């Protein structure tokens, strides 16, 4: 079956938007991912498309691209993302290899 353009997952108080990142308006993949959820009041957006690791905030929303374990796209390392959620706190980081 076909996957939706976006999904929202709730982990306790943490509201996470998930999208591929190619759709939407904006000049960059992070901007397009952000604009996909602009009306959803999410805390974090996890996106892909570019295969380039990214971790930054846009208007208070944590934007995270885990990168790629199979295609570096000019980056020095392959990467994956690791998310840890405990009670009211969370951490998201890249693992490079």
Where are these regions (language model features)?
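Active-site environment of divalent metal-dependent phosphoester hydrolases
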Residues: 1, 24-28, 45-57, 71-74
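Helix-adjacent hinge/juxtasegments
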Residues: 1-31, 35
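Short small/polar-residue motifs
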Residues: 5, 51-53, 79-80
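Binuclear metal-dependent phosphoesterase catalytic core
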Residues: 8-12, 34-35, 40-42, 64-97
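Generic alpha-helical hydrophobic packing signal
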Residues: 15-17, 43-44, 55, 82
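Active-site neighborhood of phospho(di)ester-bond hydrolases with catalytic His/Asp-centered motifs
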Residues: 17-20, 43-49, 64-66
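A short helix->loop->beta-strand "cap" motif at the edges of active sites that frequently abuts
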Residues: 60-61
């Amino acid at each position: 079956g076909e996957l939706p353009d976006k999904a929202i997952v709730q982990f306790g108080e943490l509201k996470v938007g998930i999208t591929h990142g190619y759709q939407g308006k904006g000049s960059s993949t992070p901007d397009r991912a952000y604009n996909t959820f602009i009306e959803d009041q999410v805390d974090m957006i996890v996106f892909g498309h570019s295969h380039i690791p990214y971790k930054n905030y846009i208007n208070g929303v944590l934007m995270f691209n885990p990168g790629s374990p199979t295609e570096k796209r000019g980056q020095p390392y392959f990467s994956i993302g690791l998310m840890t959620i405990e009670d009211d706190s969370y951490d998201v980081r890249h693992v490079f290899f």
